């Protein structure tokens, strides 16, 4: 990736014992389809976990259960030691603590870029308007779209819109950021500008769960790669270990199909 320093991929491969997100024996069905099967996953504060796997493996569903966009049938999920609330104001607070960046940006089309980034601060965090605007402008500068603040989303490129979506999530001061295939809807030339922002967040210590097909990002930014197939976690390893010496046949098969060089 241009402009991004690539490490050996290990970083702090052994994160601290301070678990921020814990999924324990989580199961989820869509009708007869068992999309998450006995999932156990612990994510430490400051850890970057990249979830990869073939289509239909349950990656996005796993990501969406962490802020209860998808409910689970059994098992438990805790954030910072507390179980996920089911509904109401507590759920709104949880979602403020868990930033979510979607494939499709999900910006409000009728609000300016600045208003999009201010909205959650005003409505959920009850931040003073002047302070919310100051923070929003600083975050837009940070992700490289400060000059676009007064435009509407439709006036921006896909890459710019996704960077606004990242700024909007950061504006809430989240404890963890979830990225559900954040670059898969982008034109190829826009992918790097989003990955560079994500790489910067990772280097600054943001706790991140990233569902992606971008193997370069997984190699350079992840502390841990989680490989899923058929609703199960098949393998977990540091990027170096996973890409150079995958243990499972399923992972070997997956990598042989996507790594063309």
Residue spans for each PLM region:
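ABC-family P-loop ATPase nucleotide-binding domain
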Residues: 1-27, 261
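C-terminal boundary and immediately downstream tail of ABC-type ATPase nucleotide-binding domains
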Residues: 2-5, 229, 236, 240-261
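ABC family nucleotide-binding domain
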Residues: 16-239
């Amino acid at each position: 990736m241009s402009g991004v320093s690539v490490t050996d991929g290990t970083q702090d491969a052994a994160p601290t014992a301070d678990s921020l997100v814990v999924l324990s024996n989580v199961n989820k069905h869509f009708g007869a389809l068992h999309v998450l099967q006995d999932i156990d996953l612990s994510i430490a504060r400051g850890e970057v976990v990249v979830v990869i796997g073939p289509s239909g493996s349950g990656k996005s569903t796993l990501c969406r259960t962490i802020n209860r966009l998808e409910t689970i049938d059994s098992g438990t999920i805790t954030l910072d030691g507390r179980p996920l609330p089911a509904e109401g104001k507590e759920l709104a607070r949880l979602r403020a603590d868990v930033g979510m960046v979607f494939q499709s940006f999900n910006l409000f089309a009728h609000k300016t870029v600045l208003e999009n980034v201010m909205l959650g601060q005003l409505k959920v965090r009850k931040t003073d308007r002047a302070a919310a605007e100051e923070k929003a402008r600083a975050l837009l500068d940070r992700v490289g779209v400060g000059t676009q603040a007064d435009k509407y989303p439709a006036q921006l490129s896909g890459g710019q819109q996704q960077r606004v979506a990242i700024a909007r999530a950061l504006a809430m001061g989240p404890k963890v950021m979830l990225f559900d295939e954040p670059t898969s809807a982008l034109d190829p030339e826009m992918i790097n500008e989003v990955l560079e922002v994500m790489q910067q967040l990772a280097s600054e210590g943001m706790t991140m769960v990233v569902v992606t097909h971008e193997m370069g990002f997984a190699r350079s930014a992840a502390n841990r790669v989680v490989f899923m197939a058929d609703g199960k976690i098949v393998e977990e390893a540091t990027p170096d270990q996973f890409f150079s010496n995958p243990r499972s046949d399923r992972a070997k098969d997956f990598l042989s199909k996507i790594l063309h060089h």
